[in-house]
Amino acid sequence: MPATPAWSVADVVAHLAEGDRAALASTRGAWALEGLLDDWTAAGVAAHRGEPAEARLEGWEAAADAWRWQLAALDAEGWRGRVAWVAGTISVRTLGALRLNDAWHHGRDMAEATGRRFEADAPTLTLLADLAARTIPSGLSRRGRARPGAVILVRLGAGQWLLGGAAGERPDPAANPDLVLEADPLAFVLRAAGRTSGDPWEVQGDASLAAAVAATLSSVS
């Protein structure tokens, strides 16, 4: 597994199951991250390492089904509800997007490891691109590179996002961007998830801000 060299395919399946179990518990108000994220992740995988691969797959299927049923029962207010997650409190809608993001990227990892094709359909790619773009302000803030007051325009295919230079900022729609990043949606999504290196975007404007985005972009942490 190139993206997670210490894990087998079965380990990735166990990781995805643990993530869905935690997401379900969080929406029920019964989960909070204790300690470091890496330690929690490693412990979740290690807890299932003695199980046959088939049992881990069945566990993931059950966890994913329970999580989907929970989401299917939500009304509009439920989707807006705030829950605990690995980097703080987020909306249930955002948590759903994060779980899809995690499952898609690890699914692609497993497909590559087993020599199979894995592609994103248009609706999924749109959601993944939206999540990846919207992580820019929080990534800048959490990693000490915030640029309060800056305006960033991201163009990914037919979609575009006007973003602030720090978490919580919402630029005026009429504001002139300090930085414009333009990229192929899939290339941007893979870069944000740490599956590729290099910067797959064209840059217009503030080069130092572009470097800060490149150093802090992450849709998976």
Q: For each predicted feature, which ranges?
A:
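Hydrophobic protein-protein interaction segments
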Residues: 115-175
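Short amphipathic alpha-helical segments enriched in hydrophobics
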Residues: 16, 20-27, 71, 196, ...
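Charged/polar, low-hydrophobicity segments characteristic of intrinsically disordered regions
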Residues: 41-58, 134-149, 216-221
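Short strand-coil-strand connectors
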Residues: 5, 155-159, 204
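Conserved catalytic-core motifs characterized by acidic clusters
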Residues: 34, 79-87, 169-172
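Short, contiguous alpha-helical
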Residues: 2-39, 85-142, 188
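C-terminal interaction segments
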Residues: 174-221
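Short, helix-capping/interhelical loops that line the mouth of catalytic, cofactor-
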Residues: 21-73, 77-81, 118, 123-124
